[in-house]
Each structure stands twice: as structure tokens, then as C-alpha cells.
């Protein structure tokens, strides 16, 4: 498995982070490529933040309202705060996924304004580039990086 990520804070929490004092904050962003071992994630009570998962290649399986949903390359899956999260990837499918966790008082409005929901959005190399930029900026944390990654996230919404 290849697992690359960047985080806003120097510590991590499986529950995520909630910040309703600001409009929008990216907590963390990452890339995973599963080639040798299967992977599963179970968060029965969800997280405190939002999560967007983009299937760049391969596929993944998501349990939503007791139904198993098969997501393929070019699909996104959105999880809202407190929404149960159960998903898994099989190494035989060699999935490559990008994910981002975010919080803030305007997140729901942003998703609604841009009509972002779990669906097929298609293959998009620009998505890959933007996710990689966000990961890189979260790792380096140069001056002004939070503004830069928020801008990158907006690019994801309009692509």
C-alpha cells in the first residue's frame, strides 16, 4: 500500500476535527494505492468533519444505509459529519483514491451551492494534480498555505 497524506495539525484524531468558528478549513488530505492488501475502514458514528473520497482508478465499496454501493474510477463519495462510514478496497482491484477531510460553518452550503454529492464525475487528471498540491502544501505548511489549499479545494468544486 502507498499512503501519502498531509495534515493541518501535528497530531491526528480518528474522530476528526470540528471548527465552526471559521467558514472552511481543510483538516487533512491524502492518497492511497492498494496493491497487496485489502483495506477497510469502519466508523460507526462517523467523524466530526466532512470527507470527500475520489476514486482515481480501480474501485471501492461503501456501505450506505445498509446497502453496498460499488464506486468506480471517476466516482466521488461524500460523508457528512456524524454519518456512519464503512468502506473497503480490494487489492485485486488496485484502487487509487484521493481523500480530503474538511470542516467549517459553511461546508454544507458550499456542497449545496456547487451541487456536490456522491456520484460519478468522470476521470479528471486535474483532480489528481489539485489533490497532490493540497497534500504537498499541508506537508510543507509555508506561509499562507491555508488560503492556498482552500483555493485549491474551490477548484475541485468547479471542475
Language model regions located:
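Generic protein-terminus/edge-of-domain signal
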Residues: 1-70, 118
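Tight coil/turn sites that cap or link beta-strands
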Residues: 36-39, 73-74, 82-84, 92
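A short, compositionally biased micro-patch
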Residues: 55-57, 80, 90
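Short acidic-glycine-tyrosine-enriched beta hairpin
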Residues: 66-80
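Ligand-binding loop in jelly-roll beta-barrel domains
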Residues: 82-106
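Amphipathic alpha-helical segments enriched in hydrophobic/aromatic residues interleaved with Lys/Arg
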Residues: 109-159
Amino acid at each position: 500500500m502507498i499512503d501519502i497524506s498531509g495534515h493541518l495539525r501535528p497530531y491526528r484524531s480518528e474522530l476528526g476535527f470540528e471548527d465552526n468558528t471559521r467558514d472552511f478549513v481543510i483538516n487533512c488530505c491524502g492518497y492511497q494505492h492498494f496493491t497487496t492488501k485489502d483495506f477497510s475502514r469502519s466508523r460507526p458514528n462517523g467523524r466530526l468533519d466532512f470527507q470527500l473520497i475520489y476514486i482515481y482508478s480501480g474501485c471501492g465499496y461503501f456501505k450506505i444505509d445498509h446497502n453496498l454501493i460499488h464506486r468506480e474510477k471517476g466516482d466521488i463519495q461524500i460523508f457528512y459529519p456524524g454519518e456512519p462510514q464503512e468502506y473497503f478496497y480490494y487489492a485485486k482491484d488496485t484502487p487509487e483514491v484521493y481523500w480530503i477531510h474538511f470542516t467549517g460553518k459553511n461546508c454544507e452550503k458550499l456542497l449545496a451551492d456547487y451541487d456536490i454529492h456522491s456520484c460519478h464525475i468522470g476521470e479528471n487528471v486535474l483532480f489528481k494534480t489539485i489533490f497532490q498540491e493540497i497534500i504537498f502544501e499541508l506537508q510543507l505548511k509555508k506561509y499562507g498555505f491555508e488560503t492556498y489549499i482552500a483555493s485549491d479545494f474551490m477548484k475541485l468544486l468547479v471542475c
